């Protein structure tokens, strides 16, 4: 990802050189940019029959493939808040309980850039799984 950035975002200098595997440093103004993973959330939602809710992606990347509900946390939003928002946006379901399970480093390929992510997985309970309806990034659930 660092290879995509050629100029310092502070002073515009072309002397914006890779200083480690996760950073570039400007030789003119001293600014150092670190690439850190973006926070992503994933929901495991089981209905009363023990069936896992999956959705089909409406958009690229990976349009048409199966996926779990979830997405990125927005600025000033906790991972749990982002999880609830993403599940509501994509499925119309209201998360009433989210239990953290595990996390996994990942890469999200978007607009020609590999964005490092830290995906956090949650087992979720929802208010009424009969109200599931694909919206936003989900073509179908």
Identify the function of each model-found stretch:
Residues 1-5, 22, 39:
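Short metal-coordination and nucleic-acid-contact micro-motifs, chiefly zinc-binding Cys/His arrays
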Residues 8-11, 26-29:
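Short cysteine-rich clusters marking metal-coordination/redox-active sites
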Residues 16-17, 34:
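Short functional micro-motifs and their immediate structural scaffolds
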Residues 133-141:
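NUDIX/MutT-family hydrolases
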Residues 28-52, 72:
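Conserved N-terminal beta-strand and adjoining loop/helix that marks the start
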Residues 17-23:
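Short linker/helix segments within small regulatory modules
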Residues 104-131:
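Active-site-adjacent beta-strand/loop module that shapes the phosphate/pyrophosphate-binding cleft
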Residues 47-89:
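Conserved Nudix-box catalytic region and its N-terminal flanking loop in Nudix hydrolases
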